[in-house]
Amino acid sequence: MILDLDIGNTLSKWRLKDVASSEIRSRGAVWTREEWRPGADIPDLDVVEAVRISSVARASVLRDTVALLRRQVGAVHVARSTPEALGVSCGYEEPARLGVDRWMGVLAGYQLTGGCCSVDCGSAITMDFVLPGGRHLGGYIIPGLRLMKESLKLGTRNVAIDPDSEADELLAPGRNTVEAVNHGIYMSAVSAVNRIYSEVCDREGVALPLLLTGGDARVVSRGLRVPHAIWPDMVYAGLETCFPMTAAERAGRLSGAPPPPPAPPLEKVRASLAFSMLL
């Protein structure tokens, strides 16, 4: 089995993948901790022959995690943000400072669609752009839905946005304080994603396929004007591209990859942008 770890600052996700069949056998999520408990926080390591890690947690968390795993697993691979990988050149002035989860999303997206805009809807909403030739432009970071709400210090009125709500409902004026806050936060997030996407595509002269991942991808998706696809395993797919271990991975078949979404006509993107600038 392959154990894939996506370690965040507060929440970490894992999955077990069968080497022979490439099937995902199990998956889960736990709070990030200094000391993992195999068999409790993560699967029993007796069945694991290799580990792949993407981590944006503190350096001490990654160091201690790797030390624990290497005592029991033969191969432990840690992803790093690099100046270039798999045909993509990093747009950051200091590539090592780009969050490795974002880099994994960029690499996975590029393998799937060529140029793309990858959006991770987590605690923060990050947007990264890579052109068809492999040049990563850099990206944007804005507060996610939860962080925006926490900044308002609502206390007991801090009711989460219902992920099953329809976009028309979430974009309508709120009829009480909780709705007004939730709808305002949602409007802010989706408006930012729509506007940033249009601005960058207009400036670069190319409309890019749009890929979403992260815990809030499904609800953010409902408010986007651009054709797109949701790819929950996009960070894991980045690990697969960097450290291919199964026959399917070596053949370029990435876990859970959606059909590549069509890019909208550039003229339509520009028309939408021009209209929004008149408002």
Curated annotation (Swiss-Prot):
The pathway entry for this protein reads as:
Cofactor biosynthesis; coenzyme A biosynthesis; CoA from (R)-pantothenate: step 1/5
Summarize where K(+) binds, as residue positions: 120
Instruction: Name the Gene Ontology biological process terms.
Output: coenzyme A biosynthetic process
Q: In which residues is substrate bound?
A: 92, 99-102, 177
EC number(s) in its UniProt entry?
Answer: 2.7.1.33
Name the catalysed reactions: (R)-pantothenate + ATP = (R)-4'-phosphopantothenate + ADP + H(+)
Q: Which PANTHER family match?
A: TYPE III PANTOTHENATE KINASE
Quote the NCBIfam families the UniProt record gives: baf
Name the UniProt record assigns to this protein = Type III pantothenate kinase
State the species of origin. Chromohalobacter salexigens (strain ATCC BAA-138 / DSM 3043 / CIP 106854 / NCIMB 13768 / 1H11)
Q: What is the lineage of its organism?
A: Bacteria, Pseudomonadati, Pseudomonadota, Gammaproteobacteria, Oceanospirillales
